[in-house]
Each structure stands twice: as structure tokens, then as C-alpha cells.
Amino acid sequence: LGDVEMTEEAHDFINRGLMLFPDNLILKDELCYNLEIEGDIKRAIEVCNELIDKNPYSNDYWFTLGRLYSISGDYEKAIEAFDFALTCDDSNEELKILKAYCLYMNENYEKAIEVYNDIATTDDIHIRITPLLAECYIKLENYEKAYVLLKELLRQNRQLKDSSIYINYIRCCVETGRDKEASDALMQASRLFPKNIRILSLLALTYLENGDEHKAMEATERLFTALDQVEDKQQEDFE
């Protein structure tokens, strides 16, 4: 029922079942999922802990608990839960990605890098984690390492849809003295993301610094037009 957005009906069904079978782990697992869908993360965490009390060696329960803590912003507890999950099964790459994300959010960038580098990458996972790994290096001000990662990623995938990858790449080019490369990347990004607020801001500033007032004005007008259409903007246009 929960999968077809009938959360109230699902919750009622689960509660009726638990009244009859209060120790049924399948029903409690469904309740935990349903509470998460409803946005009651605190109660979902409580139920998940009850599940772990019954089966402390379940990778799935610890993974769920870590994910719930990450949603609530309690990254320290999320990391702890993920560590327990990994002792049960260390082959879950999605779990490692989430753990690395929580380490990043907890400002433990060196450890996040270790976890990212420990992930067995397929092509799809490589595309997902390389920008995240680069962001860790940027936080550590190791712009050269981040530059190498992002340059290779963009070389292999010329039509990436994540504007933040280009923005971080441009920053790394600037920080490492590759001004021509930064300019070329900015031009490419402006073509791929013509309504992106941050890219338009960078474009206008670059033209202004280069003394091209006409193009700076054009870019600024495009920026104002994009800002006027905020209600139609996708989140990526602000990244």
C-alpha cells in the first residue's frame, strides 16, 4: 500500500497487524518504512532500533538506521550505524557511498576520501562518486588533485548534467593557475546550462574583468532574466 501512496491506509493495516502479532518483524519493518514515507523520522528511528534489538546482525536494519539518521542530520550516529552494517556485510557499495557522504557532512574529509577510494567502482558509480571525492579535496584545498579527477571525468563524459561539476572544475582551474582552461570550461558550461544562476554570474564577472563590457552586460541581462523566472527554475540552476 505504501508504494502506491496510500500511507494512511497502510499505516492502519500495519497497526492492526501489530495488534495481533506485536513481535512480527516484517510488520515492524513495514511500519518503519511507512513512518519514513510520512516524514516521521524520529518514530521510524525508534522502530528501527526495536528491529535491531530483535536482530542485531541484520545489515539491512543497520543500513536503514544509518540512512534515517543521515536524513535527520545526525551524521555521527549515521556513521556509527553504517559501521555496524559493514561488520555484517562489507560488500554494499551504496552503504559506503552514504557513509562517505556523512563523513563529508561531518567535515571529516580525509576519512571520507578513504571510504570513497575503498568503493569498488563500476562506470555508473565512478560518475557518481568522482565529483563527491573532488569536493573533499576542494575542502582540503588540494585543488590539483580535485582538478585531475574532474578533468578526467569531463574528458570521459562531455555531456554531464550536473552543473556543480563544471563550477568546481572551473574553480580548480583558477586555483591552479589554469586561466585559459577555466575560461574554456566556463564557455562550455554556459552553453550546457544557459539559465544557471551561478554560471551566468561567473560569466558576467569574467567578461567584466576582461574589459568586455558589452558581453558583460549581455550576461548580466541573461542573469536578471533567469532571476525573474525563479518560480520556473530547477534546483540545478542555482548550483
What are these regions (language model features)?
Residues D3, I37-E38, I71-S72, M105-N106, ...:
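Register position in tetratricopeptide repeats
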